[in-house]
């Protein structure tokens, strides 16, 4: 079965005090919606749309994103991404980002739902200049749990690399197989249908911020952890509530993003659920 071969190439530049997309090439099913500026001209919010409504076996999606110096870009998606399990061939998605000095990329897609039988492989590579930063998260639901579906076949692979000045800052490889062992093992899902990872990479995170990240997770019913990197921090979640996961990640994101002290967040991206 032939799937989509979609491409998206975005280039952002700093022009007269504003971050603007100066190149936006897209081929179906990927599309860039109109950019907007709820926080003012320096920070560009862009929404990447998948016009086919979900991924099916055989899809190959490639995205390349470049931020020129001083740009601030937040990229998200308009809704949950669905990976269907209808064909026994994998879906592959790759994302390669180049972030120049004094630029900040925020890669914050809404959650991904992996249907039973789906085979999904995502590769993410981010190259940072010495004074660049990136914030990113991934929220994944295994199976359509509202229908009682269990992720008992298929697989999910998530491979992330963040480099700065040619030095690896964070290499993260995760793999979940749709087997009983993976569903129940302590070092896998342990009966939880949700996993999430949030990272901020490219600068040192203070011990006070680390403690505040942990304090923000107080009262969470799922399991959480906060780990430091040489230049960054990683937060992880495993549990049953997407609302709980999203609430913690949004609070952590607001704490970590630069400029929050003097430039408080005006509003969430308009496509996010309230």
Swiss-Prot record:
GO terms for molecular function: nickel cation binding. InterPro entries: UreD. It comes from the Bacteria. GO terms for cellular component: cytoplasm. It is found in: Cytoplasm. The keyword Flavoprotein does not apply. Its main location: cytoplasm. Keywords: Chaperone, Cytoplasm, Nickel insertion. Coiled coil: none annotated. The keyword Cytoplasm applies. Belongs to the UreD family. UreD, UreF and UreG form a complex that acts as a GTP-hydrolysis-dependent molecular chaperone, activating the urease apoprotein by helping to assemble the nickel containing metallocenter of UreC. The UreE protein probably delivers the nickel. PANTHER family: UREASE ACCESSORY PROTEIN D. Required for maturation of urease via the functional incorporation of the urease nickel metallocenter. This is Urease accessory protein UreD. It comes from Thermosynechococcus vestitus (strain NIES-2133 / IAM M-273 / BP-1).
């Amino acid at each position: 079965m032939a799937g989509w071969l979609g491409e998206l190439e975005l280039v952002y530049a700093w022009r007269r005090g504003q971050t603007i997309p100066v190149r936006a090439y897209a081929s179906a099913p990927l599309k860039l919606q109109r950019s907007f500026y709820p926080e003012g001209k320096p920070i560009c919010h862009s929404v990447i749309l998948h016009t086919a409504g979900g991924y099916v076996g055989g899809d190959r999606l490639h995205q390349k994103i470049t931020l020129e110096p001083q740009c601030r870009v937040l990229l998200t998606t308009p809704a949950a991404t669905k990976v269907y399990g209808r064909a026994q061939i994998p879906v592959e998605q790759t994302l390669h980002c180049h972030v120049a000095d004094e630029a900040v990329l925020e890669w914050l897609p809404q959650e991904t739902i992996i249907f039973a039988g789906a085979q999904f492989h995502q590769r993410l590579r981010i190259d940072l200049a010495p004074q660049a930063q990136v914030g990113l998260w991934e929220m994944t639901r295994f199976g359509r749990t509202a229908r009682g579906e269990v992720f008992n076949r298929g697989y999910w692979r998530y491979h992330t690399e963040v480099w700065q000045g040619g030095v690896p800052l964070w290499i993260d490889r995760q793999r979940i197989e749709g087997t009983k062992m993976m569903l129940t093992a302590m070092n896998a899902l342990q009966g939880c249908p949700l996993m999430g990872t949030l990272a901020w990479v490219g600068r040192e995170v203070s011990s006070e911020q680390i403690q505040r990240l942990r304090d923000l997770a107080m009262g969470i019913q799922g399991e959480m952890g906060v780990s430091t990197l040489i230049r960054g921090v990683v937060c992880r979640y495993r549990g049953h509530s997407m609302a709980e996961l999203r609430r913690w990640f949004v609070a952590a994101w607001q704490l970590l993003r630069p400029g929050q002290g003097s430039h408080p967040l005006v509003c969430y991206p308009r496509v996010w659920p309230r």
